[in-house]
Amino acid sequence: ILKDIKEYNLENRVVITSYDWRILYELKKQNLNVLRGFITLQQSLTKTKKNIYEDSPWMGKKFSPDELFLLPDTIKNLEGHVWSVFYKDVTKQNVEIAHKHGLAVTVWTVNREPDILRMIEYGVDGIITDYPKKIQEICKSKNISWF
């Protein structure tokens, strides 16, 4: 994939995002110009287990309790570009911190109107949803110019 990204000069237009941070570390070793997005999940879901916890193999190395708690700081220190966070784990304060660090913030999987509106209010940069048309309709009906 790196070969194609380089060949078509897409380094600053493509974000490679992963739940397994070890992949992102390897990408950094191979090419510093590839934008990297760090997926975080601090609570287990029905089909997906959390990846942010002490000694998590998904994080690829050991982090202090502060680093596990202050994820925007941790991702900045890892020279990441995007924090892709489960929407129930994000706060407005963390979005503001991430933006101060120059990180874009995307949230996933946001499907309910109250949650969509809250994420827009928080100032996230992107919403991953199963219902993109629903977000368009909500924004249009409420005169929200978000995207």
Per-segment meaning from a language model:
Residues 1-147:
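Short loop-to-alpha-helix "cap/lid" segments that border enzyme active sites
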